[in-house]
Each structure stands twice: as structure tokens, then as C-alpha cells.
Regions:
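Conserved kinase catalytic-core helix
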Residues: 55-61, 87-121, 126, 130, ...
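ATP-binding glycine-rich loop module of kinase domains
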Residues: 2-47
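Conserved catalytic-core motifs of eukaryotic protein kinase domains, centered on the activation segment
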Residues: 35, 88, 141-145
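Residue-level recognition of conserved beta-strand positions in structured domain cores
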Residues: 17, 26-28, 36, 68, ...
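Conserved structural core of kinase catalytic domains
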Residues: 31-32, 42-46, 57, 61-101
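C-lobe/activation-segment region of protein kinase-like
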Residues: 131-208
Length: 208
């Protein structure tokens, strides 16, 4: 078992599962929280993450296969997706996948699924296909309300902020993303775009 990532909420290990490379995600306890409350939060987030991944899979967004999860131990055992992150691809000037990224995010948002952390490191190209990983901060919304549109706008703003790091190419990158998103979301795209503009105009770059 090899530790490959360590975040504020969880530790990620590369493990051997019956001869297959797999990822074990463990939500670690928070010493500053009440023990019972901490456990309930970690348990709920573990269940929510698996549910969000299942929804994404059902609507046609590629995610790691979940082999097993244990809410009591707050662990998820899932497929190890080998490939390059969107960040690495963009750093090499490969931006042709950005329209597809927009389409897949549109699929999630149409289903009411908010990813929660659309950093380019959470989008992986593996064997020519895009995968979305790390739904730990995600949530599912029912119905179409302004609150839902705001959450979607915050979701997208995380990605847009990163795309802006690419200087002169950033506008082209954002245009490709929006073309895919609009294609999938249809008329509701304009509502989300308005909320994105509102967030950015006010300077409230929300990080979740």
C-alpha cells in the first residue's frame, strides 16, 4: 500500500486488489471535531461520494469503478485510472478535449449533479477517454432553482480560474469549454453563465 495523495479530508493509497491496481480512499478523523459528529460527517460524505459517482456513471460520465466501500470505516476502494490529467494536457498545448469536458460537465449539471472540485487534476484522459474523479465535495440537487444555478456556476468557476492561467490561450480554452457546455445544457446554460458572470464581477471566487 503506497500513499499517493494526502489532502485535508482524505488520504489516497495505491493498493493491490487481487492482482489489480486499485485506489483506496480513506477519510481520516479530524481531531478538532467532536468524535461522534466527525464520524457522522465522514460517513455521510463517503456514502454521498459513492452515490454521486453512481449517478455520473448512469448519465454517461466516465468515473472510476467502485469495487467496494465501507461507510463505517469511511473507505472507498475503486479503480485506478492511469492517464494524464487535463492540467498536464493543457500544459502541452493539447486543448482539443475541452469541448468534451464542457459536454460532460453539462451532463452532470443537467442531472442536478454538482461535482464540487472541477480542478483540471480531477479530469483524467485514459486510453482516449475522459474520466472525472474525486466527487468528495459533490452534491445532487433536485429541481431547477437559482440556488442550483449558483452552485453550478461555482462548480464551473473553479475550472475557469485554472484555464485563465494559460495566458493568451485562455480565451480560446474557455470558448471551447463553453461550446460543449451550451450544447449539452441548452437554454439553461445562459442562466448558469449569468451566475458565473455575477460571481466573477463581484470578485467572489468561491473555493469549495
Amino acid at each position: 500500500m503506497i500513499l499517493i495523495a494526502k489532502g485535508a479530508e482524505a488520504e489516497i493509497y495505491l493498493v493491490d486488489w487481487f492482482g489489480i491496481k486499485a485506489v483506496l480512499k480513506w477519510r481520516k478523523p479530524k481531531a478538532y471535531r467532536d468524535h461522534t459528529l466527525d464520524y457522522l460527517i465522514r460517513r455521510r460524505r463517503t456514502i454521498n461520494e459513492v452515490r454521486n459517482m453512481y449517478i455520473a456513471h448512469v448519465i454517461g460520465v466516465r468515473v472510476p469503478a467502485v469495487y467496494f466501500f465501507d461507510p463505517e470505516k469511511t473507505t472507498i476502494l475503486m479503480e485506478y485510472v492511469e492517464g494524464e490529467s487535463l492540467r498536464d494536457l493543457l500544459s502541452r498545448g493539447e486543448h482539443k478535449y475541452l469541448k468534451d469536458v464542457g459536454i460532460y460537465i453539462g451532463k452532470m449539471h443537467k442531472a442536478g449533479l454538482i461535482h464540487g472540485d472541477l480542478a483540471p487534476t480531477n479530469i483524467i484522459l485514459s486510453k482516449g477517454e475522459l474520466y472525472f474523479i474525486d466527487f468528495g465535495l459533490g452534491e445532487t440537487r433536485r429541481g431547477w432553482t437559482r440556488k442550483t444555478a449558483i452552485l453550478m456556476a461555482r462548480d464551473i468557476n473553479v475550472l475557469l480560474r485554472t484555464l485563465e492561467l494559460y495566458g493568451a490561450k485562455s480565451e480560446e480554452f474557455k470558448s471551447l469549454f463553453w461550446s460543449g457546455y451550451r450544447e449539452e445544457m441548452g437554454v439553461r446554460s445562459s442562466v448558469v453563465e449569468s451566475e458565473v458572470s455575477r460571481i466573477r464581477a463581484s470578485g467572489r471566487y468561491v473555493e469549495r
